[in-house]
């Protein structure tokens, strides 16, 4: 038991470090969503951890990733951005890991990852509406109208924040989660000996 716990903590620490590094590898998707919303794959290590170690470890990896980001890079939004990033990643990995934990097979891994991506996408709407975007307005002194203008440059009929989040952010977050899921399915088996401590 002690060996398993030590191994799990070691793997979780390693995956947290990888997730932290992946946060810096981000890129915009021009013409599809405003450039301040960027694509990255930093939730992938948490998904790997949730499958290999359990859903709790997936949540821990999401938390540690953002804690490292605050410590190393600092925060310009009083940690609000990191909080929302953590919550979305935690929902993704927890849902996926919980489904996979009760019947471990490739089918339930795919189902869990897809369900986690969907849950994360749905949760992104209220978290952005009530937390993230009000923080942008407060800390960056950016009027809400300016934010809406970035969306309207792509779709002029996007005339409210809720509409913008449903039309743009929700599908973007879903695709982001599904891409993480696909990558996880591709690399999980080759990484399995490391993740599970097998030779």
Please identify what each model-predicted range represents.
Residues 1-199:
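Loop-helix junctions at membrane interfaces
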